[in-house]
């Protein structure tokens, strides 16, 4: 978001970057490398080619880097680990590497994390022990191949595993109807999700009157969710009822889309 409006496109030194993922561009670019930021409403490619304003605009952020003609190599890495005495310690790690010059922008970044807690000591079921994991990779390549051809694309991968468990007990004070009454509940929830995504853009200026643009995108995702609950009630030491519920849900999806356009500028004729 910028000035209350969603940013649709990011350019760095005038070159398109991080297609359909502007947040990634801002996350990987250090502030000390930025010379100037310009926000504007960019016309559609068809409008810029034809010179006719079709009214279609997208909020665009252009980032000008310091010394744009120089090759710049920069990155960062972070690592943190927990000290708790658990079987699998918690950790968090991230790394990024960038190579920038006037005609080419290359970025790679990755992250991994795990948060682990002690197992519930009195649980009937054993699972991942309240362990949550997240992993991700992201890469971008943008290049002005020559005066006619410009390409840009990125790949992203995300994987998340989330597990949780809880135990609860309710004990009621004695009454004339019973000496003791106890309700026990145990619940577990596990999910495993993964996704891959690719965005690509090709812009080829055949000549002054013809131009081709191709923008495909692909997404593949899968997910598994499982939940388990166990409930029981006892009165005066005798079991009144016991229930166990288990649910499993799996989903897989594949999506492909994009657009192809061939723009041609016809010769203008004066209307008499």
Question: How would you name each of these model-derived features?
Answer:
Residues 175-176, 232-242:
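Solvent-exposed loop segments that connect transmembrane elements
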